[in-house]
């Protein structure tokens, strides 16, 4: 029996990409949104009608295959199914706790992140995994001819998909930060610069809760070029390896894991220079803190990121000890790590 379980696991891993593709299909067909729009579980024919309506097509969906997609995703607990027995047995499909995170109009929707991670341009990078193990070559560059930042700058469509994905997790991450880190944020006076802040969603959300804070959103020129005007937010473009706008505190989310230790130290030292409040100033870092022995919620996802990040950016995820060593090398001796109910943790690095 143990041998059969081992065989079963290999089959499951072999076809695990189908999970992602079925999820992507459900998002592209807007199945969760169609069910949600009815306010109750609906039939397969109603889902098909919604798909046809959304696509403005005269061609009817492939209902037999749609039923297979739904059967598969019900088994994966993405949707629910129960049967009504009137004159004939009819299956009714509803939303689960998982599919609610796929609603396009839901503030905390993960749909854009799924679409980015399953995009052919993203998936292409994974085909160079063996190559990376053998010679540490830049896998994104192997797949696309340049690094991810250059590629995003030169390809507006991918840049939009990438920025939408990053923006989609802002409400999730900032919601957890704002509810679990009130003391750490409430003591900040003056200006906060969000380094690598994307299109400015995080700093804007922070300023809604703490109106006394002045916000700067700092990112690469091609990112800032697409950033919307946000009340009170100053958008500044530049290079984190050159200099960072002056502020009383620095916020960085998912930036340092993109780079080597050497490059991170350079960025962190630039952050130190940028902080004007030398007595109370600090850097607030939102990053994954790996614990390979842990089996808590999100730990599996953290381990996936540990494989993903080196391939896409040449960076890496870090353990608590590795974070402390890195920050010590950059000149920070007072460090505090706080676990919150999302994938990354809060790492505070104080000037004194």
From Swiss-Prot:
It is found in: Cytoplasm. GO terms for biological process: methylation. Optimum temperature is 30-37 degrees Celsius. S-adenosyl-L-methionine binds at residue 219. Its main location: cytoplasm. Inhibited by S-adenosyl homocysteine. It catalyses: desmethylxanthohumol + S-adenosyl-L-methionine = xanthohumol + S-adenosyl-L-homocysteine + H(+); xanthogalenol + S-adenosyl-L-methionine = 4'-O-methylxanthohumol + S-adenosyl-L-homocysteine + H(+). Pathway: Secondary metabolite biosynthesis. Keywords: Cytoplasm, Methyltransferase, S-adenosyl-L-methionine, Transferase. One of its GO terms (molecular function) is O-methyltransferase activity. One of its GO terms (cellular component) is cytoplasm. Homodimer. This is Desmethylxanthohumol 6'-O-methyltransferase. It comes from Humulus lupulus (European hop).
């Amino acid at each position: 029996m143990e041998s059969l379980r081992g065989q079963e696991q290999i089959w499951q891993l072999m076809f695990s990409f189908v999970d992602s593709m079925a999820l992507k299909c459900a998002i592209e067909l807007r199945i969760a949104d169609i069910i949600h729009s009815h306010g109750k579980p609906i039939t397969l024919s109603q889902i098909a009608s919604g798909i046809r309506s959304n696509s403005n097509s005269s061609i009817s969906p492939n209902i037999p295959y749609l039923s297979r997609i739904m059967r598969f995703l019900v088994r994966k607990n993405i949707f629910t199914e129960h049967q009504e027995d009137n004159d004939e047995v009819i299956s009714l499909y509803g939303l689960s706790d998982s599919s609610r995170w796929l609603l396009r109009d839901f503030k905390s929707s993960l749909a854009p992140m799924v679409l980015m991670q399953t995009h052919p341009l993203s998936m292409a990078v994974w085909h160079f995994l063996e190559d990376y193990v053998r010679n540490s070559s830049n896998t994104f560059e192997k797949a696309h001819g340049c690094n991810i930042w250059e590629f995003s700058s030169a390809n507006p469509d991918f840049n939009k998909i990438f920025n939408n994905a990053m923006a989609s997790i802002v409400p999730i991450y900032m919601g957890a930060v704002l509810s679990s880190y009130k003391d750490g944020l409430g003591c900040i006076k003056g200006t906060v610069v969000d380094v690598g802040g994307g299109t400015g969603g995080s700093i804007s959300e922070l300023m809604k809760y703490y109106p006394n804070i002045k916000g700067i959103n700092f990112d690469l020129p091609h990112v800032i070029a697409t950033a919307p005007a946000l009340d009170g937010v100053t958008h500044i473009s530049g290079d984190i390896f050159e200099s960072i706008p002056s502020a009383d505190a620095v916020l960085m989310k998912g930036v340092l894991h993109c780079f080597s230790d050497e490059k991170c130290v350079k960025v962190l030292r630039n952050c130190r220079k940028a902080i004007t409040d030398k007595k109370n100033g600090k850097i607030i870092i939102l990053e994954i803190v790996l614990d390979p022995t842990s089996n808590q919620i999100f730990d599996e996802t953290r381990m996936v990121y540990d494989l993903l990040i080196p391939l896409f950016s040449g960076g890496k995820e870090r353990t608590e000890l590795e974070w402390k060593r890195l920050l010590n090398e950059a000149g920070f001796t007072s460090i505090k790590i706080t676990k919150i109910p999302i994938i990354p943790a809060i790492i505070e690095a104080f000037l004194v």
